[in-house]
A protein has these predicted regions:
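An N-terminal amphipathic alpha-helical segment
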Residues: 1-19, 106, 128-150
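Interdomain/boundary linker segments immediately adjacent to catalytic/signaling cores
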Residues: 1-51
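A short acidic/basic microdomain associated with nuclease active sites
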Residues: 48-92
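Short secondary-structure capping micro-motifs at structural edges
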Residues: 62-66, 94-101, 129, 140-145
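Conserved catalytic cores of phosphodiester-cleaving nucleases, focusing on short active-site segments
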Residues: 77-83, 106-124
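A recognition module on extended beta-rich or small alphabeta surfaces enriched in W/G with H and D/E
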Residues: 88-109
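Acidic, metal/cofactor-coordinating or nucleic-acid-engaging core segments within structured domains
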Residues: 118-183
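Non-catalytic C-terminal interaction segments of nucleic acid-processing enzymes
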Residues: 160-214
Length: 214
């Protein structure tokens, strides 16, 4: 079964490679300038390069009973330890003629929400940095926690900060806040590396917080 350290290592390796590519191409802006939604494909590629199955934007299992597939809460990415997996298994079709042989049960997959926050943007210091870090992120934890069909899940928090010290301090502050609110969040599997400072960010922190089974 996949673990937060496995996922953190895979994503860090992929983002390091992207940082090196930005430097080689002498890009005016690095990948830290990208909007969160545009960073998701980088995370997906990193996981695939590690030989993992990647299923972006999957509906939460508790919402599968909704006949309208376009509706319901969605998880940023669902990960399996087999890149050959063709799909996630719908519990409603398990054991029926409509079941998919190579599908992965939702209970066996790793459900990951992604959040990225940058201390600096192309417009300068991000004034909403602290609020963005401490408020919406906790909402993702609650979504994972609330679904009874999710056994393995976590939150990926990618921080772009001026220094390593800032990142480590802010990750600890976020974790401490979750504990004080009673969220079932485990200590993070945290990684980090220097990035070329183009807009004010000199450090990329990658942290995966396990949410269930802690």
């Amino acid at each position: 079964m996949l673990s937060p350290p496995d996922i953190a290592d895979a994503i860090t390796a992929g983002l390091r490679a992207r940082a090196a590519q930005d430097d080689l191409e002498q890009s005016v802006y690095g990948f830290d300038s990208l909007a969160e939604v545009k960073l998701h494909p980088l995370v997906h590629s990193a996981l695939r390069d590690a030989g993992l199955g990647v299923f972006p934007e999957q509906r939460y299992p508790s919402d599968w009973i909704n006949p309208k597939r376009s509706e319901g809460l969605r998880c940023d990415v669902v990960i399996t330890d087999d890149a050959k997996g063709v799909a996630l298994r719908d519990p409603r079709t398990r054991g029926t003629l409509f079941d998919t042989l190579d599908a992965v049960d939702p209970e066996d997959a790793y459900w990951l929400e992604i959040k990225t926050v940058s201390q600096y943007t192309t417009r300068g210091p991000f004034k909403g940095y602290s609020k963005e870090l401490l408020s919406p992120v906790a909402d993702d934890v609650k979504k994972l926690w609330a679904d009874s069909l999710i056994f393995h899940s976590g939150l990926l928090l990618i921080l772009f900060t001026e220094t390593r010290d800032v990142a480590e301090h802010d990750l600890l502050a976020w974790f401490d806040r979750c504990l004080k609110r009673g969220y079932p969040v485990a200590s993070p599997s945290a990684r980090g590396f220097e990035i070329s400072n183009r807009i004010g960010n000199g450090w990329c922190a990658v942290a995966v917080f396990g949410v269930r089974g802690v």
